[in-house]
Amino acid sequence: MRHRKSGRQLNRNSSHRQAMFRNMAGSLVRHEIIKTTLPKAKELRRVVEPLITLAKTDSVANRRLAFARTRDNEIVAKLFNELGPRFASRAGGYTRILKCGFRAGDNAPMAYIELVDRAASQAEVVAAE
């Protein structure tokens, strides 16, 4: 029985899943929009939104928590110097998921996940697979 088990397995073991979402969260923070499958985008939302909430209060302890979750000082710096102040007045819902059709090879549903207050001039999209 799978009572009270939240989250998707995505055909990966736990360490692979953790590493994948750590990498995807870093890519999303760095580029502010990535293209991935719809289930991965929905799960990534559960990883990124608490990181941005953490970044709204700048402290050494919060920076260490963010580093423990991302393992990248560049990502931590962007979270606390840019994204935290940008979303200071927003109480949640920092990401948006836009469906974008199906992948050619296996017909998997694809989606863009982006930060909501992203500058419109950034037209490039990074594929995260």
UniProtKB/Swiss-Prot annotation:
Keyword check for Ribosomal protein, yes or no. Answer: yes
The molecular function GO annotations come to: structural constituent of ribosome
Check the record and name the InterPro entries matching this protein.
Ribosomal_bL17, Ribosomal_bL17_CS, Ribosomal_bL17_sf
Alphabetized UniProt keyword annotations: Ribonucleoprotein, Ribosomal protein
Q: Where are the transmembrane segments?
A: none
One CC-aspect GO term: cytosolic large ribosomal subunit
Q: Biological process GO terms, please?
A: translation
Please give the subunit comment from the record.
Part of the 50S ribosomal subunit. Contacts protein L32.
**PANTHER family named in the record:** LARGE RIBOSOMAL SUBUNIT PROTEIN BL17M, RIBOSOMAL PROTEIN L17
Q: Which NCBIfam families match?
A: L17
Q: Which family does it belong to?
A: Belongs to the bacterial ribosomal protein bL17 family.
Q: What is this protein called?
A: Large ribosomal subunit protein bL17
- Which gene holds the coding sequence for this protein? rplQ
